[in-house]
Amino acid sequence: MLWETIVEENNCSMDCNISNNTSSSSSINKMSGSRRARRSLELMSMDQEELSFYDDDVVPQDQQRSASPELMGLLSPEGSPQRFQIVRQPKILPAMGVSSDHTPARSFRIFNSLSSTCSMESSMDDEYMELFEMESQSQQTALGFPSGLNSLISGQIKEQPAAKSPAGLSMRRPSVRRCLSMTESNTNSTTTPPPKTPETARDCFKRPEPPASANCSPIQSKRHRCAAVEKENCPAPSPLSQVTISHPPPLRKCMSLNDAEIMSALARSENRNEPELIGDFSKAYALPLMEGRHRDLKSISSETVARLLKGEFSDKVASYRIIDCRYPYEFEGGHIEGAKNLYTTEQILDEFLTVQQTELQQQQNAESGHKRNIIIFHCEFSSERGPKMSRFLRNLDRERNTNAYPALHYPEIYLLHNGYKEFFESHVELCEPHAYRTMLDPAYNEAYRHFRAKSKSWNGDGLGGATGRLKKSRSRLML
């Protein structure tokens, strides 16, 4: 009985529990259904709320509800580059007693990244265009000055009127150097110059065209060119001074004007029917000539020199100088009467081609009239030293008178044929002293070497390899 009673009690309790569980489950189901209905109502009433990305909307605190994006289906699927985020912020209502029943419909403002980027770029482009328009308008109203210049200038820009030039004619100096195409009329023009343009500024640096006039000869062009150069070197006259037209200077004498005279002189010198002409091709030689070993030099015999010393040519020769080119120890051993010892080129320069000597020679040539002033060179045999000094004087004299060719300071130069050796053998009475000392005299071997080296150094020959040349000259002189 006891066990039956216990079983019945357990069954009752189980029935109660089952009933209780059934009632509880039904109540739970009812509660879950009510909650689902409430959520559906909340979703239906979500149109009254405003969801935004920005912080510019306000919602009353009593209406704040939590809505998950998962429920709204606003999130993109996994892996999509477009992701949305809903931000809801409280909205502060204005403090007004009566609120309007009709409120504007609230909607969602959802933008993706691409649309937001495009809108931002378009807004920035609009702002830049507005800035460019404002800058262009400010440049147009800035009186032609570059942009930004107004920020550098603090004061007001003032323009001073140009000073009026004094009354009267004024000369305008050309902006570039005078050339062939510019004439005197262009210089003295008083008209206002035209405004400079890029074309004119570029043309002023070009070479001007030569004058196209058929009457303008090359000589006239040179004349205008010389006048232009002289005007540039002269100081500019004052504006109030009277303008005077300067005439071009006469042409200077040049070598081209004497071409006819030179050609006629050369023709006369080459003509065998006429006598030999002196260096300036003006007249014939005063002394009789003979054939010598040097065809470029005019040689005379010992007999002619003796006659000159005796005065037989006094009607033709105003003065003469005999230059002995031997070494001093030879000259002291015996020389021609009145001869002068010059054996280096430096001595020739000092004797003949200084400024004082050339001026004195020109004066003597002018005073002598038709008579001549002659020079005679010689050495021991007139084979090396005498001809060398004679050529040196003629060449340097020709160089000094290049601008006055064929004029010369010493146009008449002679060479004594066979030198002092032959003259001493035939006219010993005209020698001082009556002796003859050779260059290779054994007693003066040291003096020979000394003066030989000295003459070569003065003449610029140098001392290198002098031994072979000395042996060659000695063997030639001993023949």
Curated annotation (Swiss-Prot):
A Gene Ontology molecular function term of the record: protein tyrosine phosphatase activity
Residue spans crossing the bilayer: none
Effect of deleting the gene: RNAi-mediated knockdown in gut progenitor cells blocks intestinal stem cell proliferation induced by bacterial infection but does not block induction of the TNF egr.
Region annotated Disordered, chain positions: 182-218
Keywords: Cell cycle, Cell division, Hydrolase, Mitosis, Phosphoprotein, Protein phosphatase
The protein's Enzyme Commission number: 3.1.3.48
GO cellular component: chromosome; cytoplasm; nucleus
List of residues that carry Phosphoserine: 455
Catalytic activity as recorded in UniProt: O-phospho-L-tyrosyl-[protein] + H2O = L-tyrosyl-[protein] + phosphate
Domain (Rhodanese) ranges: 316-432
Cross-referenced InterPro entries: MPI_Phosphatase, Rhodanese-like_dom, Rhodanese-like_dom_sf
Compositional bias (Basic and acidic residues): 199-209
SUPFAM superfamilies: Rhodanese/Cell cycle control phosphatase (SSF52821)
Name of the protein in question: M-phase inducer phosphatase
Species whose genome carries this gene: Drosophila melanogaster (Fruit fly)
